[in-house]
UniProtKB/Swiss-Prot annotation:
The lineage of its organism: Bacteria, Bacillati, Bacillota, Bacilli, Bacillales. It holds the Pfam family Aminotran_1_2. Belongs to the class-I pyridoxal-phosphate-dependent aminotransferase family. Homodimer. This is Aspartate aminotransferase. The modification N6-(pyridoxal phosphate)lysine is found at residue 239. It comes from Bacillus sp. (strain YM-2).
Amino acid sequence: MKELLANRVKTLTPSTTLAITAKAKEMKAQGIDVIGLGAGEPDFNTPQNIMDAAIDSMQQGYTKYTPSGGLPALKQAIIEKFKRDNQLEYKPNEIIVGVGAKHVLYTLFQVILNEGDEVIIPIPYWVSYPEQVKLAGGVPVYIEATSEQNYKITAEQLKNAITDKTKAVIINSPSNPTGMVYTREELEDIAKIALENNILIVSDEIYEKLLYNGAEHFSIAQISEEVKAQTIVINGVSKSHSMTGWRIGYAAGNADIINAMTDLASHSTSNPTTASQYAAIEAYNGPQDSVEEMRKAFESRLETIYPKLSAIPGFKVVKPQGAFYLLPDVSEAAQKTGFASVDEFASALLTEANVAVIPGSGFGAPSTIRISYATSLNLIEEAIERIDRFVK
């Protein structure tokens, strides 16, 4: 029989986050008391008014195809959101709605990358960036942002990484997995290098609404019209409105790129789920109280978990400013407990301490683990106690 699989998928690395989450769920199904700190989604239910909007749309018969790039009403809601939150002006032909921000990113790389084009990715990175770039024929080029620099790349690092094959750089702020937020000044320095070298900026802003202790979100596209023209902004309702399962994300930027993405989407998904689009319209046009309530809950959890995690022997923790993750360096704790690697340490936490965390190797940071505080405070505190006992 001929080889069944294409070469391009043979080097794919399965999503670490989804794999650990699945293993934890499997253990729970066996009756094991597992506490999951690996979740990449809010633990709150979608607000009722948003669910009602989806139900109403179906009852009114809105169950057919929509335009491939999204409902005009949803595009308009997104345009108003950009005006309100980011002081950015976009036209409908500069917006595409897709099946979650992940799929929007995938579609973007498919339409902008030729074989061998390079995309600069800061380390630590979200697990899907390198895989999506490779699937589009691109080459990931990594810049390591250390804990000493708060896990944020510098303009000088970016400048040194650019070659004649560089097509784009990814900026994720607030960041998954670090929770760090770039300042306006840092983004201005990065944008200057991108403009000088004529490379596209891919700005992933999905955690925009989850900011703590006075941190402020600033979109790199806000710097100037020139920067905006060279930036594709990625966002969605998954994290801000606790709608991960609804699968609605979007991109805003250059009309030619957006048009190409829309053409590709017409052959891959037809359109995002119709009811989900109506739910997203309500998410942006309806009351925003729940967004702030969820943010406050995450902030409260962070203030509880950070000092306790920092007190565990061998844990070095940089306090995050956004998202709902911490990324402690636990190499010392792993060594202290007799493990050859942090991956083995993380695996033992699951099988022996019944706490699920994500090994940092999946994010390009093998000395770390990612801990999510998108779960109840009681469970978080119990999980930290288990980790503390395990290490001691």
